[in-house]
C-alpha cells in the first residue's frame, strides 16, 4: 500500500508540473477559422474558432456539406506570415526560464483575396472578437486572426500583437446549385471528368478549339501559284523573346525589409566634369619639366594687375624652355621680374593641355558671408564621422514630432520622451535614448523636401530618409537626403497612423540655425509626419544602433553618482565615442565606411 500511495502522489505531482509547463490555447483544425482571441489575467492566450456559413462550411440537411481545402503544419515557434496562412492553434510551453509560444499555421487558397484590416495589442484581461461582417443586410466578409506575435512592453508585461484580415465571402452553395443544370448523379460525375480524361462526347471539341489546325502548323515555306511566277516566298515569322518580369538584382549586403539597387559602374574621379564651352584655341605650351613643385596656395579674391600687356597682339608667346612658368586662372599671377626672367618657381599641380593666348579678367568666385561649421569638417572616412563625431547629420529645430503627450518641436524633446516611430512593420511609440547632436547656435544648410499636399521635412545632406518608387508594390530603400529626386515618393502617416506614399514635388536648400538629432530605440523616427532614419550611414546602421544602446545601458550605472554628469543631456556626443571608434577603425574594414 505504501508503494501505491507513493506512486499515486508522484503521478499527481507530475501532472501538476506538466499542466503548469504546457498551456494549450486551442486549435481550429481544418474545418473552422480563428475569429476570437482572449488573454487571461496570467497572460495566457486562448483562441476560438467558427465555421462561417458564407464560405459553404455547413452540415445542415438543407445544404450540401462542404469541407474547406485547408492544410495545416505542425506546431512551430514561428509567426504565420505567408499570404495564404492563418494561425489555427496556439501552445505555450514553459521551459523553466521563459515561456515560448508555438503556433499552428494553416494554408487556404481563399486567403489570396484577404485584405489587412488592422493590428491590435492585447494585454492581460483583454480580448478581440471578429467574425461575420454584414453589409446592406448581406454577408460580405469574415474577419479572422492571421498573425500572432508575443512581445513584452515597457512595463515588463506580456503583450500580443494580433494581425486581423478580412476574407470576402464566396457564393453560397444554394445559389451555385440553382445555376447548374439538373443532372443525374452519373452524368454529374461524367461532367467533372471531362477536363481530365476528355471522354465525354458533349464537350469533346473543347481541346480542338485551342489548337491550330494541322495544316497551318505545318505550313510550307513555298507555295505553288497559278501565275507567271512559279514560286512565292513567304516571309519568315519573326521570333521574339517572351516577356518576363524583371527581377531586382540580389545584394548580399541588403538589410530586411529594404531593397537596394545594384552597385554602380566604376568611373574615374571628376569624370565628365570638364567644361568644354570655355575652351579657346591657342598655341600648345611645351611639356612641364621634372622640377615642377605643387603650389597649394588658396585663391585670393583681390585682382592682381599683371606686369605684361593684356591685349592679344602684345601677349608674349610661351618660352621654349623646360622651366616654363605659365599662369593659372585659379591662382595669383607672378610679378614682372619673375615673369620676364622665367625663373623656376612653384607651379600649381594642375596644368591644362594648352594655354589660351588671351587671359580674361579674373573673376573671384562668390564667397558666402559665413561658413557652416559642419560643412568644413567634410565626410570623414572613419567611424568617428559615422557615429557623429565629424559629420553633423541632423534635423532642423522647427520640425515637429508626435509624442504620447501631444505634438512637440524636435528642439524641445528630452531623453525618455516617447515619439512616434516605426518598429519593423508597425507604427508605434519609441523612447528617445539620447541625442547625437543638440546644438541651438549651430548654423547649417538643410535640404527642404516638400510634397504637393503640404508635407515637408528638413534634413542635412547625408541624413537617411526612406523613399521608394511611386509605383505600387515597390520596396522601401534608405538614401541620403541629397540623393532624393523629384520622381521619388516619401512615406507619410495619416491621422490614423497608416503609412502612405506621397510624391516629391519640390526640393530646395535652406540655411537655418540649430541642429538636432534624437536617437530612438528603433533607429527610425517620424518627423513632420514623414518617416526618416536617425542615422547617416546605411551599411553601419545596425552597428550604430547597437553601439549607442550598449552605451546607454552602461552609462546608466554611473548616472546617479554625484561627480558624473551625462553629456547626452546637454546635447553633445557621449564621452569616449571618438576614442572607442578610433580603436574600432583598426578592426572594421574601410569598405563598410
Curated annotation (Swiss-Prot):
GO cellular component: cell surface; extracellular matrix; extracellular region; plasma membrane
UniProt-annotated site: Cleavage, residues: 394-395
Post-translational events: The C-terminal domain displays an autoproteolysis activity.
CDD domains hit by this protein: Hint
Tissue: Expressed in 4 to 7 sheath and socket cells of the anterior sensilla.
Stored InterPro entries: Dev_Signal_Hedgehog-like (IPR052140), Hedgehog (IPR001657), Hedgehog_Hint (IPR001767), Hint_dom_C (IPR003586), Hint_dom_N (IPR003587), Hint_dom_sf (IPR036844), Intein_N (IPR006141)
Site (Involved in auto-cleavage): 460
GO BP annotations listed: cell-cell signaling; intein-mediated protein splicing; protein autoprocessing; system development
Signal sequence, renumbered to the chain: 1-19
Domain of life: Eukaryota
GO MF, one example: peptidase activity
Glycosylation sites noted in the Swiss-Prot or TrEMBL record: 95
Keyword terms: Autocatalytic cleavage, Cell membrane, Developmental protein, Glycoprotein, Hydrolase, Membrane, Protease, Secreted, Signal
Site, Essential for auto-cleavage: residue positions: 463
Function: Intercellular signal essential for a variety of patterning events during development.
Family the entry assigns: Belongs to the hedgehog family.
Cited PANTHER family: PROTEIN QUA-1-RELATED
Name of protein: Warthog protein 6
Organism: Caenorhabditis elegans
Gene label: wrt-6
Amino acid at each position: 500500500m505504501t508503494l501505491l500511495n507513493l506512486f499515486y502522489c508522484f503521478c499527481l505531482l507530475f501532472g501538476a508540473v506538466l499542466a503548469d509547463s504546457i498551456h494549450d490555447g486551442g486549435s481550429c483544425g481544418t474545418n473552422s477559422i480563428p475569429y476570437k482571441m482572449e488573454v487571461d489575467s496570467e497572460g495566457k492566450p486562448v483562441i476560438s474558432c467558427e465555421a462561417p456559413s458564407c464560405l459553404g462550411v455547413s452540415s445542415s440537411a438543407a445544404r450540401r456539406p462542404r469541407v474547406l481545402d485547408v492544410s495545416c503544419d505542425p506546431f512551430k515557434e514561428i509567426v504565420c506570415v505567408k499570404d495564404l496562412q492563418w494561425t489555427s492553434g496556439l501552445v505555450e510551453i514553459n521551459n523553466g526560464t521563459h515561456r515560448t509560444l508555438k503556433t499552428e499555421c494553416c494554408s487556404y487558397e481563399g486567403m489570396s483575396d484577404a485584405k489587412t484590416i488592422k493590428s491590435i495589442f492585447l494585454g492581460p484581461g483583454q480580448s478581440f472578437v471578429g467574425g461575420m461582417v454584414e453589409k446592406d443586410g448581406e454577408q460580405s466578409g469574415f474577419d479572422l486572426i492571421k498573425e500572432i506575435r508575443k512581445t513584452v512592453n515597457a512595463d515588463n508585461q506580456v503583450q500580443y500583437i494580433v494581425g486581423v484580415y478580412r476574407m470576402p465571402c464566396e457564393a453560397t452553395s444554394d445559389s451555385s446549385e440553382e445555376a447548374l443544370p439538373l443532372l443525374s448523379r452519373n452524368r454529374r460525375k461524367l461532367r467533372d471528368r471531362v477536363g481530365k480524361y476528355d471522354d465525354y462526347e458533349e464537350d469533346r471539341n473543347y481541346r480542338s478549339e485551342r489548337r491550330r489546325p494541322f495544316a497551318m502548323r505545318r505550313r510550307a515555306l513555298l507555295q505553288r501559284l497559278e501565275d507567271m511566277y512559279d514560286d512565292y516566298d513567304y516571309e519568315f515569322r519573326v521570333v521574339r523573346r517572351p516577356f518576363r518580369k524583371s527581377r531586382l538584382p540580389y545584394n548580399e549586403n541588403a538589410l530586411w525589409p529594404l531593397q537596394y539597387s545594384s552597385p554602380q559602374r566604376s568611373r574615374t574621379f571628376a569624370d565628365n566634369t570638364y567644361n568644354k564651352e570655355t575652351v579657346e584655341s591657342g598655341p600648345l605650351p611645351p611639356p612641364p619639366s621634372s622640377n615642377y613643385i605643387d603650389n597649394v596656395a588658396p585663391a585670393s579674391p583681390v585682382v592682381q594687375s599683371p606686369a605684361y600687356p593684356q591685349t592679344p597682339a602684345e601677349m608674349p608667346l610661351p618660352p621654349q624652355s623646360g622651366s616654363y612658368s605659365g599662369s593659372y586662372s585659379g591662382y595669383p599671377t607672378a610679378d614682372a621680374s619673375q615673369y620676364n626672367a622665367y625663373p623656376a618657381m612653384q607651379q600649381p599641380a594642375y596644368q591644362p593641355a594648352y594655354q589660351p593666348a588671351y587671359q580674361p579678367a579674373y573673376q573671384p568666385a562668390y564667397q558666402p558671408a559665413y561658413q557652416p561649421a559642419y560643412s568644413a569638417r567634410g565626410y570623414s572616412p572613419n567611424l568617428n564621422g559615422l557615429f557623429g563625431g565629424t559629420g553633423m547629420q541632423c534635423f532642423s529645430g522647427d520640425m515637429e514630432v508626435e509624442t504620447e503627450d501631444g505634438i512637440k518641436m524636435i528642439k524641445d524633446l528630452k531623453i525618455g520622451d516617447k515619439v512616434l516611430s516605426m518598429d519593423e512593420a508597425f507604427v508605434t511609440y519609441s523612447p528617445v535614448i539620447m541625442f547625437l547632436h543638440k546644438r541651438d547656435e549651430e548654423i547649417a544648410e538643410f535640404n527642404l523636401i516638400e510634397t504637393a499636399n503640404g508635407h515637408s521635412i528638413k534634413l542635412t545632406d547625408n541624413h537617411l530618409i526612406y523613399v521608394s518608387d511611386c509605383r505600387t508594390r515597390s520596396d522601401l530603400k534608405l538614401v541620403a537626403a541629397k540623393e532624393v529626386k523629384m520622381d521619388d515618393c516619401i512615406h507619410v502617416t495619416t491621422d490614423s497612423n497608416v503609412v502612405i506614399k506621397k510624391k516629391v514635388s519640390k526640393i530646395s536648400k535652406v540655411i537655418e540655425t540649430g541642429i538636432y538629432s534624437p536617437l530612438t530605440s528603433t533607429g527610425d523616427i517620424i518627423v513632420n509626419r514623414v518617416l526618416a532614419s536617425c542615422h547617416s550611414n546605411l551599411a553601419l546602421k545596425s552597428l550604430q544602433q547597437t553601439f549607442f544602446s550598449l552605451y546607454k545601458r552602461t552609462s546608466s550605472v554611473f548616472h546617479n553618482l554625484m561627480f558624473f554628469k551625462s553629456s547626452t543631456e546637454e546635447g553633445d556626443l557621449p564621452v569616449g565615442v571618438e576614442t572607442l571608434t578610433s580603436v574600432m577603425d583598426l578592426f572594421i574594414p574601410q569598405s563598410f565606411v
